[in-house]
């Protein structure tokens, strides 16, 4: 979740959205791998 808190520092809405999407994807991948 560090990437999510770090992305808040960016003022650009587009960059913020992309970083949030990337962070969410990373969390989903990690949770999916842990299930296996």
Swiss-Prot record:
Transmembrane feature ranges: 13-33
Keyword Membrane: yes
Superkingdom classification of source: Viruses
Membrane topology summary: Single-pass membrane protein
Keyword Transmembrane among record annotations: yes
Subcellular locations according to the entry: Host membrane
Chief place where the protein resides: host cell
GO cellular component: host cell membrane; membrane
Keyword annotations of the record: Host membrane, Membrane, Transmembrane, Transmembrane helix
Protein name: Protein P4
